[in-house]
Amino acid sequence: VQSALDDISLEIARGEFCVITGASGAGKTTLLKLIFREDVPSSGQILVNGRNVSLIPRGKIPFLRRTIGVVFQDFRLIERKTIFENVAFLPRILGLDHGRQKRVAFEALRRVGLSHRMASFPSQLSGGEKQRVAIARALINEPEILIADEPTGNLDQDLSLEIVRLFLDIHLRGTTVLFATHDRVLIESVGHRVLTLAHGRLVEDRPSRRAPAPALEGSAAVSGSAEGQLSGDLA
């Protein structure tokens, strides 16, 4: 059986912006799933802030995911709910009182420039606006790590660059960002570290062209190694 990832070993520092690239099927999505514990490696380990996420009991996985925001290519918005309701959904599930739900949802939408569209429905938004809502939803818990899996795949070049600038702004606030894309224009515009995967292997680790940021205490580090066929669906 062909491995989804084979002999991957890397470390991502606190507060780092890291681009993960490679052709379709190279292993980008698989690597990201390992980090937020949607999959587990058949061998090796994934450490987030020094903790082996593969050993986290099923009932504790939601606590890990409260520290990790995830943005997908397909937005995953609830069409029958307003933008505000989409973003406030997680705080409601977590049991925040109504006033707190409103405050954190408004702040998340404000950060992505959509506080004026709170009453709109997803069908009334452009693709770029929908992705901004998805980013706001991922930011709702002030995550230490923000994972983006091909977040611009359905957008044109101008909108894609706009979304990249938003991720760069989020990174400047101290968030560790893992950004998967195969778009070379976006990769060069970011200028940060680039990990290139091919056939499940790490074939290049290009350092950032930007000046290093100061050490950060409030963000998260990711390190580890993984190989072999992945098993489990713990979403």
Show the residue positions of the predicted features.
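Conserved ABC transporter NBD signature motif
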Residues: G44-N52
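Conserved ABC ATPase signature
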Residues: F121-L125, E129-Q131
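Conserved catalytic motifs of ABC-family nucleotide-binding domains
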Residues: E142
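Short coil-to-helix segment of the ABC ATPase nucleotide-binding domain corresponding to the Q-loop/switch region
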Residues: K81-F89
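Helix-to-loop junction immediately C-terminal to a conserved catalytic motif
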Residues: F36
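Catalytic Walker B motif of ABC-type/P-loop ATPase nucleotide-binding domains
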Residues: L146-D149
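ABC ATPase NBD coupling module
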Residues: Q2, V53-G69, I170-L172
